[in-house]
UniProtKB/Swiss-Prot annotation:
Protein's UniProt keywords contain Acetylation: no
Parts forming coiled coils: none
Binding site for Mg(2+): E189, E193
Organism: Homo sapiens
Top-level taxonomy: Eukaryota, Metazoa, Chordata, Craniata, Vertebrata
GO cellular component, one term: nucleoplasm
Motif (Nudix box): 175-196
Residues involved in substrate binding: F56, Y87, R139, A144, D151, H156, E158, S274
Protein name: Uridine diphosphate glucose pyrophosphatase NUDT22
Similarity section: Belongs to the Nudix hydrolase family.
One of the record's GO molecular function terms: GDP-mannose hydrolase activity
Mutagenesis or variant effect for E193A: Abolishes enzyme activity with UDP-galactose
The Nudix hydrolase domain, residue ranges: 118-285
Catalysed reactions, semicolon-separated: UDP-sugar + H2O = UMP + alpha-D-aldose 1-phosphate
Length: 303
């Protein structure tokens, strides 16, 4: 396994649809206050704001844990235990210079390396075209995380979407609405980043959850989504620009039959950790189980 990514959870073959997933929101699933108090988080945030005054804080869902139901059991197959966190807390924990120490201290104090970390839950998509290519984007060098690297479409589900005009509280966030936001957010990210019409996208299937070890184990839920457009049609939509076009500088495609061998190619080193997690889960859950001997991935030329 690539050291930049670890798998927290792998869904059953094919992936799980929305109706097979439950979410439990509780303050018990929030991060623990830092051992020396949270003043360090405030100091980091204020320093970042001075250097980047355009930054703004926003609430995020925090993944505490996830449990699959026993094989063959009826009802929902996956339970997500979620708390609330924020972008500010992410910068002050997962992205702080003391992140490794916080993980060690969490293991010592609570038996959980993530106990003191914000761990905002992200989403990503293995997006397949009608002519059997997966879609990749080259991240802009202006973005804060993984600038210039190759990614899959993705982002974050937003608690604020379920509480417009208010401050999200655990008791106000019904589990099924949270699951719906999780699934709809990955579709919205595809629409915004690749500029695709929503009606061209299938309902997502959850492949699993991967941790980004370069940001102290921040988790991302990775999905499989099919698009009814060909790769060339997707390229044309992307080129016409979308709401988040500034976040990437180019689009390219890898044949799905060759994705199994992606780890053995030079392209793998260009993938950001979240994209690596998405591809590993795609290969294990949705991709060809045979992993037939294939050559290097056939790429449609990048822009």
């Amino acid at each position: 396994m690539d050291p930049e990514v670890t798998l927290l959870l792998q869904c059953p073959g094919g992936g799980l649809p929305q109706e097979q997933i439950q979410a439990e929101l509780s303050p018990a699933h929030d991060r623990r206050p830092l051992p020396g108090g949270d003043e360090a988080i405030t100091a980091i945030w204020e320093t970042r704001l001075k250097a980047q005054p355009w930054l703004f804080d926003a609430p995020k869902f925090r993944l505490h844990s996830a449990t699959l139901a026993p094989i063959g059991s009826r009802g929902p197959q996956l339970l997500l235990r979620l708390g609330l966190t924020s972008y500010r807390d992410f910068l002050g924990t997962n992205w702080s210079s003391s992140a490794a120490w916080l993980r060690q201290q969490g293991a010592t104090d609570w038996g959980d390396t993530q106990a003191y970390l914000a761990d905002p839950l992200g989403v990503g998509a293995a997006l397949a075209t009608a002519d059997d290519f997966l879609v990749f984007l080259r991240r802009s060098r202006q973005v804060a995380e993984a600038p210039g690297l190759v990614d899959v479409p993705g982002g974050h589900p937003e608690p604020q979407a379920l509480c417009p005009g208010g401050s999200p509280q655990h008791q106000d966030l019904a589990g099924q609405l949270v699951v719906h936001e999780l699934f709809s957010s990955v579709l919205q990210e595809i629409c915004d980043e690749v500029n695709l019409p929503l009606l061209t996208l299938s309902q997502p299937l959850l492949l699993g959850i991967a941790r980004n070890e370069t940001s102290a184990g921040r988790a991302s839920a990775e999905f499989y989504v099919q698009c009814s457009l060909t790769s060339e049609q997707v390229r044309k939509h992307y080129l016409s620009g979308g709401p988040e076009a500034h976040e990437s500088t180019g689009i390219f495609f890898v044949e799905t039959q060759n994705v199994q061998r992606l780890l053995e190619t030079e392209m793998w080193a260009e993938l950001c950790p979240s994209a690596k997690g998405a591809i590993i889960l795609y290969n294990r859950v949705q991709g060809s189980p045979t992993g037939a001997a294939l050559g290097s991935p056939a790429l449609l030329p990048p822009l």
